Amino acid sequence: MSTTNLAAQAFAKNRAEELGFDLWGEFVVPLYYDRLALDEVRKPLIFEGGRGCGKTTLLRYLSHATQLSPNRELTPETLPKQIGLYLRADTQHLRTFRGEALSEDDWQRAFEHDLCLSIATELLGALQLLSSTAQRRQTFPGIEALDFAAWRDFDASAPTTLAALIRHIRSARNKFSMWLNNQDGDQPRPTFLPLRPALIELIGVVREQLDFMRDRVFFVFIDEYENLLEYQMRAVNTRLKHSEAPLIFHIATKRNGMVTRQTLSSEQLQERDDFRTCDIEEWAEADFSLFAAELFCSRLQRKGIAVGPQEIEAGILLSLTGIKTRLDDQAYRRETLEAARKILPGLSNESAARHVLQDKSLSGRLRDNINTGLKLSDASYQPDDFIRTDLAQDALCVPALLHQGKKPKDLLAELEKKAAKKTNLFDTANWTHNYFSASMYLLFLPLPTPCVLYAGFDAFLKLSKGNTRHFLELCHLSLQGTDVIGGQVQSVDIKTQAMAARDASALFVKETQGSGDFGNRLFHVVNTLGQVFRLSHARPSQSEAERTHFAISGGDLKPDAQKLLSECLKWSVLFVAPETKVKGARLETMDYMFNPIYAPYFGISFNKGRKLELPASSVETLMTGRHEEMNALVKSYQKAWKLDGDGDQYSLFSQA
């Protein structure tokens, strides 16, 4: 029996919002999990990373909907020491907390009132979930008998039972929303709750009246912190600075999402003293090859497809105690990776080169490129003199070497040496190592089919750069139309994978338009920078091979440009790292790397190749220039690199 698209369906859900709040039995425990040390931590954590790296999924796993899931068997001994309360900072809602109707101080109190009601709702909801079945009420007695009379110190009309108080607070939130959205109307202003005193009193009731909750600590997880207005950040920062048991605040944010460390007092947040940063993106990338392979096998197994180690089917990915085995068992690691590579095979460099020689269109382009290079020096030679199936990789590098001024007779001599297994410059001067991949991308640049180097599980890892969502989308598109026969999924064709990589890349380029307040601008930054790198890849000499990152030279950026650069980092359009290979006497700054997921759309390398030195003035044009100025920037590089015509270049503002 054949089932089409069953395998692709396994990867259709690639956003936390699609998975819901209860992730018990579905969440693949990340390999870095033990680094969080949640049982010991009593200091706020800042979970940092780009969109798609798994922050939201992790926070939902740590929150009560999963911890106290009806699908989980709980006892007083297995009841989590920390009860997680999850809140998401909704941009549209938060921006209603401003305007001339109130002073900023009053808006801050209104915001804290709303935050208090939201946290109280989560806390009471956790108790309700813990008593949701007869068995649980027997295991955790007394929840329904809780007396919340102490809450009347803050709200005299509040009922005292759990179910009634939940309804009352829900009603209070609704009335608050009505007041918030009708500032010019007759809605009475509510009495604002004091955030920490009210919540501490509520927690006190729970801890005093329920023995099994006596030592429990409540973790408030605020997701998408970067959506807060600045005064709201100061309010949350204050809660971070003064967090202590039994109520500790944690936040998740994109890079550069914390625009201020100021609190409501003169104090500022200090790392180490007040919080610890958990760089989820960096931690995930360290073991991403194994984690991605595990996720790949797990998703397919849930669809009834036989793939990967038996340990995955037995639930090792769902267990906190299984992490050490996953990391240390080399046989398990090998079997998991091999399973993913079997379904998503890639080409070795040698196989990719042979693919070119066997393809009529690609081999024809190779001959044309060699012929063009020969005309620069000695047209008496023929392209076929340099094309040898036993030296396929080296043959692909010949056009670049000819355009660098190497003599045809010298290249032939070096090829002969290599064929005879003698010392040769293709090896000792790293000609093949330096120019093979760049030469492959150049051959494919003007063609409708994407480069085969984008295909394969290992290529998908590099394209994803630790981003789970990007990896899942690459798998989803690759497996569309793939048959499952007898419970086995077939290997995906190389060209199909490469096309899927380009389609996914186009999707994520387009998605930059929705990246916050500056989304449209970031979309144009991606298109402009992508075209500059594409032009660099189109240079016949490949003297600066595989350019995919830049450094800024010639001064500091103006504030507006610096802000946009920060947005590029926040939304993972660019990644930043300390600069390497600084030329001349210039001081070391930073390298800005193009997100590799954009590479297939522009036909460029996903590797960190050579660097482009961009003057600060050009970066300012890139970040804040008008459309015509950005076009002129691209054309200036086209002229400087002596590239005629733009027929096979993407339109600068093409819609991905």
What are these regions (language model features)?
Residues E26-L31, R35-V41, E100-A101, I200-L202, ...:
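Short linear interaction motifs
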Residues M258-D274:
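Short regulatory helix/loop adjacent to the ATP-binding pocket of P-loop NTPases
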